[in-house]
Regions:
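Active-site beta-loop-alpha junctions enriched in small/polar residues
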Residues: 272, 435, 516-519, 544-547
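Core mixed alpha/beta domains of very large multi-subunit molecular machines
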Residues: 442-446, 453-542
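Often metal-dependent polyanion-binding catalytic scaffolds in large enzymes
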Residues: 1-470, 488-491, 539
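Alpha-helix N-cap recognition
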Residues: 388-391, 521, 547
């Protein structure tokens, strides 16, 4: 055991030395870029500031004073360059540390695969899903208790707006590309050999140096939403389905009789729905953001379906397919000329044809979003237009069941299972959009709608009685009635009307909850319930108690 411990410590020290070397190499590359673009004097100042800062951290008063004097003497242009140099340096350090963690994880996974099953190296990594499952089993959790536990798992991660976030998506994309170059450089056998050229890293650093760090104009709400969606597009859609797969794998190994949970991890967002204190979050903005969410989900799903259709080329001459697959295929065979062409080209590949038809429907849904006005009363109300998430899920389930019933059970895993996980997590809406408004706005709107100028002065009991009576007879308002209302009341009702349209056209999964800021009484919730009835919305109401 002692020898093993010493070996692990030695390995850890070597790994940390590799990280330090990577950081020094990146710092050197940054220095060369600064020298080439700004000149050697700028780099000399960077090094002086760095040296003084390190000394001042050890308590050197003279160094601290010199640091302050040096910074005070900088011109605005040189001060900007120094700020850029240190900002970019720490971004590079962050990239190196992230890559270091990824490298460690990969090494540990590889070591686990090659280790003796009885050795310590074969144990799952700490904080992994399998590690948690094993710990629960060791604590005596039986199958029935485990089934109840996983059935009750419900995790929703919520994105919120941060108006102070100034980093542009352009910079995020550049940093991501640089991170990929560093990863490829660390493993040249598996990647692009051109990335091994040090000049490749320096070109990326130079591009970052010469790119504006901040937006020229203040970001609009839709820009904030696009920045949030960037993380979905670049990382989450690719990574999160693996968590579902990890859960299934861990349960299969350690609790084979326990059924893995479905849809236990989802996302929500406040960006584009939180109008408390932000007049820029209008109903039109909410509709736009819902469209952005929907479009990304449809495009991601469409791409995955196309890839799957190219791989799931099982021939019905080699393997029988279920009647359910035949029925779905019959219903969609004449969806378009393209599907008819696929049918004539691949007449004996039913899964490919069925997925091709689904891809066609996803493409039509994307075109509908691109056309705009999908969440308006003027949009065409074609019953065949909406593409329900459940219809997509049913197609995947039918294909999976057909494969498992025959000799293609292996094909029901892999890409098909991953696309099912993707749908479970993101649906066809990416993230549920929560709506939020201050209770005072609801109170003012209700006062106008009930024609009670004294409404705010009523005591709680009187408000409840009045609202209960109003709720009993409330019906959705028509266009004529809405047109007569004040702008402030329309600002309260219109987002709810958009929510009702989104639930109808995108499905209820597109919306999350309705949050009431500064809730202090039951009447605050009854007011929102009344407003929901007037607009046809049906969001769960979540009171937010604040001080």
């Amino acid at each position: 055991m002692a020898r093993s411990s010493v070996s692990r410590k030695s390995t850890a020290l070597k790994e940390l030395a590799q990280l330090r070397t990577e950081i020094r190499t990146l710092g050197t590359s940054l220095g060369r870029v600064i020298t080439q673009i700004e000149g050697p004097d700028t780099l000399a100042t960077v090094e002086r500031l760095r040296t003084l800062a390190k000394a001042s951290r050890t308590g050197d008063a003279a160094a601290a004073a010199a640091l302050g004097e040096t910074v005070s003497a900088l011109s605005p242009a040189e001060g900007f360059n120094q700020a850029m140099a240190f900002t970019l340096y720490f971004e590079l350090v962050n990239l190196a540390e992230e890559n270091f963690r990824i490298l460690l994880l990969r090494r540990r996974r590889a070591a686990r695969l090659n280790a003796d099953p009885k050795s310590a190296e074969a144990r799952p990594m700490r904080e992994s899903i399998e590690s948690a499952v094993i710990e629960l089993k060791q604590r005596g959790v039986d199958g029935a208790a485990m089934q109840q536990l996983v059935d009750n798992i419900a995790i929703e991660l919520v994105f919120t707006a941060h108006p102070t976030e100034s980093k542009r998506r352009t910079l995020l994309a550049k940093l991501r590309r640089l991170a990929e170059i560093l990863r490829q450089r660390g493993n040249p056998e598996a990647g692009n050999l051109s990335f091994a050229d040090p000049a490749c890293v320096e070109r990326e650093i130079a591009s970052l140096w010469l790119t504006d760090r901040s937006r020229v104009a203040r970001p609009e709400v839709a820009d904030e939403a696009r920045t949030g969606l960037w993380y979905f597009q670049s990382t989450l859609y690719e990574t999160l389905p693996r968590l579902h797969a990890d859960m299934e794998r861990a349960l299969k190994l350690h609790y084979p009789d326990v059924k893995a949970p479905a849809r236990w991890l989802t996302f929500g967002s406040w960006i584009g729905g939180d109008r408390d204190g932000n007049p820029n979050v209008t109903a039109a903005v909410t509709a736009q953001v819902l469209g952005l969410h929907r479009r990304l989900a449809l495009e991601k799903m469409g791409h995955a379906v196309r890839e799957l259709s190219h791989n799931l080329t099982v021939s019905d001459l080699r393997e029988s397919v279920s009647p359910a697959v035949r029925r779905q295929l019959k219903e969609c065979r004449h969806l378009s000329k393209h599907i008819e062409l696929l049918g004539s080209r691949y007449p004996h590949e039913p899964y490919r044809l069925l997925l091709g038809a689904l891809g066609e429907r996803l493409g039509l849904a994307v075109a509908e979003i691109k056309g705009g006005e999908v969440l308006t009363d003027s949009a065409a109300s074609d019953d065949d237009s909406p593409l329900p998430t459940e219809a997509v899920r049913e197609t995947f389930d039918v294909i999976s069941a057909s494969l498992k019933a025959g000799r293609g059970a292996l094909l029901a895993e892999g890409e098909l299972r991953e696309i099912q996980h993707t749908l479970d997590i993101f649906g066809l809406h990416t993230a549920k959009l929560d709506l939020r408004q201050h209770s005072a706005h609801h109170e003012n709107a209700v006062a106008e709608l009930l024609d009670r100028s004294d409404y705010a002065k009523l005591d709680e009991a009187a408000k409840r009685e009045l609202l209960a009576a109003a709720l009993a007879t409330a019906k959705p308002l028509g266009k004529t009635a809405l047109a007569k209302l004040s702008p402030s009341t329309r600002n309260v009702l219109d987002p709810l009307h958009v929510a009702a349209l989104a639930a109808e056209k995108f499905g209820p999964g597109a919306l999350g909850i309705y949050i009431i800021s500064m809730t202090d009484a039951v009447s605050d919730m009854l007011e929102v319930a009344y407003l929901h009835k007037l607009t046809g919305a049906s969001l769960p109401i979540a009171p937010l108690f604040e001080t």
